[in-house]
Amino acid sequence: MALLVEKTSSGREYKVKDMSQADFGRLEIELAEVEMPGLVSCVTEFGPSQPLKGARITGSLHMTIQTAVLIETLTALGAEVRWCSCNIFSTQDHAAAAIARDSAAVFAWKGETLQEYWWCTERALDWGPGGGPDLIVDDGGDATLLIHEGVKAEEIFAKNGTFPDPTSTDNPEFQIVLSIIKDGLQVDPKKYHKMKERLVGVSEETTTGVKRLYQMQETGALLFPAINVNDSVTKSKFDNLYGCRHSLPDGLMRATDVMIAGKVAVICGYGDVGKGCAAAMKTAGARVIVTEIDPICALQALMEGLQVLTLEDVVSEADIFCTTTGNKDIIMVDHMRKMKNNAIVCNIGHFDNEIDMLGLETYPGVKRITIKPQTDRWVFPDTNSGIIVLAEGRLMNLGCATGHPSFVMSCSFTNQVIAQLELWNEKSSGKYEKKVYVLPKHLDEKVAALHLGKLGARLTKLTKDQSDYVSIPVEGPYKPVHYRY
């Protein structure tokens, strides 16, 4: 794979699609900043003291216009940053170009192959002979995964000289990961151990990545502290819910121009993401059916006037299918064969294994017709009818549209900045062990408060008597940790 790192005139490394788009990217970044009051407030409050000075931060998170504002917030607080995207389709090339030119090392472009994707991840983690990053901003956990798998392989190699075997797995993506680690072992057999020793911690953006972290914590495999940003209320109840409510119909309409009103839409999963997706489809005039494993979530869907059925009940009747579960094997090729002609199948969960893309790609005689980038019609030979799959089963709202709007991402990314500050400020205190943590309630409330003024809100303030009566401090926090919102 002949990929070469390029350098700006100032010597900063990068690999993006088209640097001539940098001016366009800068214009959109300036527009987004106005919609991201939380990040702007972080620069105002913390910028003068440069609290991240000396910190090396690697980011593996969708390289969008909104992420560009996050990156420039981190650099404004003193950090040095290297960045890659966490999805092969989610990069906005003009955003990548602007940041690569002006602010940070970026390795990302829309439409990467899996081989290119992991090359970019490796580059973002590569800080030269001095080891890796001090901090990671992760989304989905791929940067964290690469380090953990690298350390594991190095330990085996040190013990008996055995290299990782890419053929030991059927997963084509993990084969690439093992190949990268194998190649690295031949150059520096302690590469990932050096990264582990330097790392202060990671802050994780999304549900899927958080699941990985908790799994590693349970088995004692977690190598460094982690802050679970996803379960901050101002992330999961805003980005996951309202962001998806905005971006699902946006992606559907950009990709297909289909009229949603009157259609039958199946939302697989009714967590925060599923709730946002179902609300969007209902508002657009679709008849919404939810599939769920959890009786509580199922009952919530029913209380919203939605039907709750199994996929098998509705697979031949629905027009639009969207997976939101964070699980695997939700819509299989046998389901797709039974769907209406030109039924739309898409995913808004982090990875591409909710939809059985491998089964679809290897189905005997199936024909793939690319309508436009990230919009494909797959025709089955035995029925001569087809389905439309968006973004190859990956995140359709970023593959087919531009993801969540700036304002709601400001909530999520302000949490990320606070998490990075917390990890860096406490790096020598012993406060954070090799465990997964959630930001405290008062910081969650602070993130929300930073966004109220932009929307013209004015908070009511407790009197001292009221505060004493309900045993809630006048300045908060206002809810107990277990409050569900």
Curated annotation (Swiss-Prot):
Positions of disulphide bridges: none
EC number annotated for this UniProt entry: 3.13.2.1
Superkingdom as given in the UniProt entry: Eukaryota
Listed GO biological process terms: one-carbon metabolic process
Binding, substrate: T64, D139, E205, K235, D239
Any GO CC annotation of this UniProt entry: vacuole
Keyword NAD included in the entry's annotation: yes
Pathway(s) this gene product operates in, as recorded in its UniProt entry: Amino-acid biosynthesis; L-homocysteine biosynthesis; L-homocysteine from S-adenosyl-L-homocysteine: step 1/1
Family: Belongs to the adenosylhomocysteinase family.
Additional note from the record: In contrast to SAHH1, a mutation in the C-terminus of this protein is not sufficient to abolish transcriptional gene silencing.
Protein name: Adenosylhomocysteinase 2
